[in-house]
Amino acid sequence: MKANMRCWLLVAFFTALPMVARAEWQAVEKVETYAIAGKTGIELYESIGERGPKIRGLVRAIAHTDFKLTWSRKYENQDGACVLVSARPNLTITYTLPKPAEKLPAASRRNWETFFIGMRDHEKVHGEMIKKLVKDIEAATVGMSVPGDPKCLKIRAELKKRLSELFVAHQQRNRDFDRVEMGDGGNIHQLILKLVNGG
């Protein structure tokens, strides 16, 4: 009886391996900072405006979340069809946040810490959206099959189409989130007011 039980447990374990392997990946998350000058909230905010990261080389932001995503994909020819049998992501998310270059007075430091934590948490939401994008890509592409594609050439065009659709949806989620956060009365708007007004 015990031997049979061990056998069934082993079968269940190895049957579950592909599912486990798919869930194993983890994003590497890094925080980079840029130096800002000033002792008061308004001085710090003005320095952010001068030194903040440029988005697409055009507009400066308070903070920014970027990512690098590569894939290890395995294709198989199955009866003349090309099948994407596995895809393992390698994801690095980088958060860029401001950091005062000098020690701040006590009152400014408290206000700054509130501002910084709020901005960090905002960017972390963008990070979670990136992770969702990667999971959506996995769900939409692993197992996809293109008939009449023994050399796995046509499947790449179909893959590109699916990725494009998912990325457009991802960008829209980010824009919608920022619109609420940065609008009048939004979280970022409130954080800026409290930093600048010292309250």
Enumerate the language-model features and the residues they cover.
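Metalloprotease/metallohydrolase-associated module, dominated by Zn2+-dependent proteases
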Residues: 24-103, 147-199
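Membrane-interfacial alpha-helical segments at the cytosolic side of multi-pass membrane proteins
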Residues: 131-141
